[in-house]
Amino acid sequence: MSDTPQSPAQDSLAEHDEARPMRTVKSFVMRAGRMTEGQQRGLDLGWPKFGLELSDEVQDFDAIFGRQAPRTFEIGFGMGHSTLEMAAAAPDLDFIGVEVHKPGVGALLNGLLTQGLGNVRVYSCDALEVLRHCVADASLDRLLLFFPDPWHKKRHHKRRIVQPEFAELVRRKLKVGGVLHMATDWEPYAEHMLDVMSAAPGYRNQAEDGRFVPRPQERPVTKFERRGERLGHGVWDLKFERVD
């Protein structure tokens, strides 16, 4: 999740062209950024405590967190403000956050140290690779995707993270009854998300009208979102529950 309109999205999607070898299409852009003193402190002191490395093996998150608890996986937490707010408000839940932007990773880690929170673990890599290799099937209670890069231009739509392959990967990782919660401030992308998820097998749209849900109270409001509301911009939330 991010306080910017286009936070680096967080994963990769494979597309196949019969005339060419398979290649990887990234849905995120690695953006350089200077580290503040606090962000560097987070990386230096927080990463050894809360950071996780990509592995080829399924991870035992009960052992990593030292308990059994409902588990949320967040793709693209931006600067980590909303992650910190959610984790502080729900100490009985565990959060796994993934972000490729190093200043954002450092900011979240510094926040965890400052607030004394222990229910968050952090990856700094491709979120889809974490899902594929590190997360057991049917193990997540929620997956959060807040304000991913909408890739406005039509020729870039293939870079959007929400695609049929993504929907199926997430379905496998969610428990039955688990929920994929997405939010975007770009209406065409909201419609794209709705189309993809409505066609994906094994899900139920939790919206009463079969479209979008009211903003859930558990999703923190970002600075960017508040600014957008003052300007009359909309935000669309989608919740799809795994039913099969």
From Swiss-Prot:
Top enzyme class: transferase
Classification via Pfam families: Methyltransf_4
Region (Disordered): 1-20
Function of the protein: Catalyzes the formation of N(7)-methylguanine at position 46 (m7G46) in tRNA.
Keyword flag Membrane: no
Residues the entry annotates as binding S-adenosyl-L-methionine: 74, 99, 126, 149
Catalytic residues, chain numbering: 149
GO cellular component, one term: tRNA methyltransferase complex
Protein keywords: Methyltransferase, S-adenosyl-L-methionine, Transferase, tRNA processing
Metabolic or biological pathway, per its Swiss-Prot or TrEMBL entry: tRNA modification; N(7)-methylguanine-tRNA biosynthesis
Protein name: tRNA (guanine-N(7)-)-methyltransferase
GO molecular function: tRNA (guanine(46)-N7)-methyltransferase activity
EC number in record: 2.1.1.33
Biased composition (Polar residues): 1-10
Family: Belongs to the class I-like SAM-binding methyltransferase superfamily. TrmB family.
Matching SUPFAM superfamilies: S-adenosyl-L-methionine-dependent methyltransferases (SSF53335)
